[in-house]
Amino acid sequence: NLSVEVNGDIFHNLHLFANPIDKFRPSDKEIQRALKKKKGSNLIYFGPGVHNLPNDTLFVPSGTTVYIDGGARVYGNIFTEGAHDVNIFGRGEVHPDGRGAGVWVRRSKNVRIDGIVVSQLPIGQCDSVELTNVKSISYYGWGDGMDVFSSSNVILDGVFCRNSDDCAAVYASTQGFKGGSNNVLVKNATLWADVAHPIN
């Protein structure tokens, strides 16, 4: 991961990310089944191009994989809400219409997210969530990267955060989430806080 800066200007720089080989990309057959909405497909696929979510929102059901392909830019919010066994993979981007979280993981269990680029990715009242090779970039106030609220067994591995607030913060009961947080691991991470703290 590189930051290309001209004359020391860190606010108008270019971020270059080198990704590992994508081992989660679905087969062409699986993609075609998803695009045709064939019965039995548990894949939601976003191909290269711009995608505007209906009502700016996608709630991911349990047992579903969302794949955001390289070159895809999804506008809106992707939620796992009260779900389990959810995967969000890819090399594309998710951005809300304006400020806020591109992906929200709430009251869910067994969620894995790999490779995508988001504005923010908070985790609230969850168990067993793993983020690998995820990039979070925000430029606005209160633009925390990957906050963890009242959650257990959370791994942030190989993530990159460039945020205009805390990059990663761990909280107990707050913002409508109840309970403590435990077994939260941040490793192999690059945390670049323009404001506030890399870890709070």
Describe the residue ranges of each PLM region.
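An acidic-aromatic substrate-binding cleft motif
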Residues: 22-48
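Right-handed parallel beta-helix
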Residues: 63-65, 70, 84-95, 109-119, ...
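Conserved mixed alpha/beta catalytic, RNA-binding, or beta-rich assembly cores of soluble enzyme
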Residues: 77, 146, 185, 197-200
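Glycine-rich phosphate-binding "P-loop"
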Residues: 97-103
